[in-house]
Amino acid sequence: MKLLSCLRTALCLLGLLAMPAAAAYPEKPINMIIAFTAGGSSDVQARIMQKYWNKYAPQPWVFVYKPGAGGIIGFTEIAKARPDGYTIGGLNVPHIILQPLAQNAQFTPDSFKYICQVVNDPQCIAVRKDSPYQSTSEIIAAARKNPGKIRVGLVGPLSGHHLMFLDYGKKYPDAKLTSVFYKGAADQNAALLGGEIFGNINDVMRSIDEFRVLNVAAEKRNGFLPDVPTLREAGIDMVSDIRRCFAAPKGIKPAELDALRVLFKKICEDPEYLADMKKAGQPAEYMDGEAFAAYIAGQQAHAQEALSAAGLLKK
């Protein structure tokens, strides 16, 4: 009997040894969904990250572009993707908060599992270099004289640019600007260069070379534009930023989410990655996935208030 038991144990051990080892995740390329146009801010940042993903991960990314509607098309694709660990994507905040509050979106912030935040990008007011406007205050004064005549480009609707525009409208109801929406920053900037609009609400990175930045909507001056005053310095009490993160569809296996978080953290701590981000004008700021989920929850009240004041809150 004892001999039989030993034989059984030996056979079980042989069976385990014969089993193939579990494949390391990821074992095939990962689809990376970008919800904005190629060449825009989100794409530039993701391309830098891809370079270092290839340094640390065994499989590459396959970029999939789904631009339009302020990111809602791409965000929906991420939320609805099979949660098998092989589709992830870039998300923008406050976009993913605003859109479900104002529309019948097919996602909410709870539709995602957050890998990490990678960028905290303050917004700015930018004009062409030959623009007659030298400050945001001059634009406001001109808008008071000719309400609705000044056209401002936004990536939207229901984007971070749009939220800043709504905050402006609430603060300066007598200085109406007209918003013009674009699919991505590349389209928006081309429109400004072509004279289709008079100014942009934009991010700093996309404005440094081609435009004159009037003011930055941040608590303090931007390191890339140290001579440009903040809106508060100009007497305009507004702060606005866009946070960029990466996420997977809700339902991803915890082990795969953890693996992604480890890989992204390695990238975000890589000195060469940080140097490349700085060179590209991308304000890198890492926040882990759980902390970022808590940050999003804390932004709901502001988003609801802004949409309600503009009559855009979903009935």
For each feature predicted by the language model, list its residue ranges.
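Positively charged n-region of N-terminal signal peptides that target proteins for export
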Residues: 1-8, 201
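Bacterial N-terminal signal peptides
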Residues: 8-18
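N-terminal (or domain-start) structured segment
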Residues: 23-111, 149, 157-161, 169-199, ...
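A short beta-strand-turn-helix
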Residues: 24-25, 139, 234
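An extracytoplasmic/periplasmic, membrane-proximal ligand-sensing/linker region
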Residues: 27-29, 170-171, 254-315
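Short coil/turn segments
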Residues: 37-39, 93-94, 128-133, 155-159, ...
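Hinge/capping helix and adjacent helix->loop/strand transition within the periplasmic-binding protein
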Residues: 53, 77-87, 100-187, 241-276
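C-terminal lobe and pocket-closing loops
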Residues: 203-269, 298-301, 315
